[in-house]
């Protein structure tokens, strides 16, 4: 187990147990995804929470002000606990681990689909069917991303499987094939 998981797993497991005992698991998972999105998209927030300059009480007050009406009381307690223990800088890792454990417990496969441009509903539906057959399960969580560097097409990651149907991938494979020939 990687060192970071050694630190984050106990927090994630304990929090999931609390959420289960209060029948809040689905709500907490939705909140975890929202806070993760905020953490990853707002470096000012993550930098402030990770800063050793900001006192623990200031961090807890900021967390209370930001999230008291947005999350369950147990989620707010987790945030304050992480601040108290000087682990709030690991919030994203704790929440990512929480989501991993949640998916493992419910046998949900995570599929990341990165496309060169935004997919319309028909394209998403068609791709979902293909990804379900690749994953071997209908129980999927889809994470859609857009990366214009792919030039066209898409890349699908499901567990350890990668399907690269992007133009950038085709160009790379063509370059490798040409390098072998010469």
Swiss-Prot record:
Gene3D superfamilies named among the record's database cross-references: N-terminal domain of the delta subunit of the F1F0-ATP synthase (1.10.520.20)
Membrane topology listed for this record: Peripheral membrane protein
GO-annotated cellular components: plasma membrane-derived thylakoid membrane; proton-transporting ATP synthase complex
The UniProt record lists the keyword Transport: yes
Compartments where located: Cellular thylakoid membrane
A Pfam family recorded for this sequence: OSCP
Key words of the record: ATP synthesis, CF(1), Hydrogen ion transport, Ion transport, Membrane, Thylakoid, Transport
Subunit structure: F-type ATPases have 2 components, F(1) - the catalytic core - and F(0) - the membrane proton channel. F(1) has five subunits: alpha(3), beta(3), gamma(1), delta(1), epsilon(1). CF(0) has four main subunits: a(1), b(1), b'(1) and c(10-14). The alpha and beta chains form an alternating ring which encloses part of the gamma chain. F(1) is attached to F(0) by a central stalk formed by the gamma and epsilon chains, while a peripheral stalk is formed by the delta, b and b' chains.
Function: F(1)F(0) ATP synthase produces ATP from ADP in the presence of a proton or sodium gradient. F-type ATPases consist of two structural domains, F(1) containing the extramembraneous catalytic core and F(0) containing the membrane proton channel, linked together by a central stalk and a peripheral stalk. During catalysis, ATP synthesis in the catalytic domain of F(1) is coupled via a rotary mechanism of the central stalk subunits to proton translocation. This protein is part of the stalk that links CF(0) to CF(1). It either transmits conformational changes from CF(0) to CF(1) or is implicated in proton conduction.
Name of the protein this chain belongs to: ATP synthase subunit delta
Species, as recorded: Prochlorococcus marinus (strain NATL1A)
Gene: atpH
């Amino acid at each position: 187990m990687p060192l970071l998981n050694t630190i984050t797993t106990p927090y994630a497991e304990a929090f999931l147990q609390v959420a289960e005992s209060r029948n809040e698991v689905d709500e907490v998972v939705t909140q975890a995804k929202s806070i993760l999105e905020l953490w990853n998209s707002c470096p000012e927030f993550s930098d402030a929470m990770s800063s050793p300059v900001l006192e623990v009480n200031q961090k807890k007050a900021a967390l209370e002000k930001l999230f008291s009406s947005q999350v369950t009381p147990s989620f707010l307690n987790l945030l304050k606990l992480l601040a108290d223990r000087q682990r709030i800088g690991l919030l994203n890792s704790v929440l990512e681990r929480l989501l991993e454990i949640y998916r493992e417990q419910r046998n949900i496969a995570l599929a990341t689909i990165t496309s060169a441009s935004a997919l319309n509903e028909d394209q998403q539906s068609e791709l979902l069917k293909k990804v379900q057959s690749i994953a071997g399960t209908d129980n999927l969580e889809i994470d859609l991303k857009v990366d214009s560097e792919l030039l066209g097409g898409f890349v699908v990651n499901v567990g350890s499987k990668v399907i690269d149907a992007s133009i950038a991938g085709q160009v790379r494979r063509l370059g490798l094939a040409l390098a072998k020939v010469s």
